[in-house]
Amino acid sequence: MARYSVYRLKSGAMVLDCQADLLAGLPTRFSAPLLKSSDVPNPIARLHPSLKIVGERRIMVTNEAGAILVSEIAEEIASFADDDMAIANAFDMLLTGY
């Protein structure tokens, strides 16, 4: 598991892993759901970064982030390690308002 990797869950949903790699031994991962743009009617740019995954635009729904069981992860499909600032800024917005 790697921070800022996108995983497809067994349910078919996509999530962005946001947990520090140092905590890889835990049975859960802190992640944010990645929804289709059409499912997020009024995204807030800084809170909801837009990511292109396998040719499709997805919105990181930061305000719905939470823990998922590692056993629910089916496959890794992308990495956004190069977009770490936009992702970290989304959590800053959620937690501090800035």
Locate each region found by the language model.
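A near-ubiquitous, low-amplitude feature marking generic local secondary-structure context
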Residues: 1, 5, 14-17, 34, ...
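Compact nucleic-acid interaction/catalytic patches
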Residues: 3-12, 16-47
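Short conserved beta-strand and strand-loop elements enriched in small hydrophobics
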Residues: 48-52
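C-terminal terminal-subdomain/extension
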Residues: 53-98
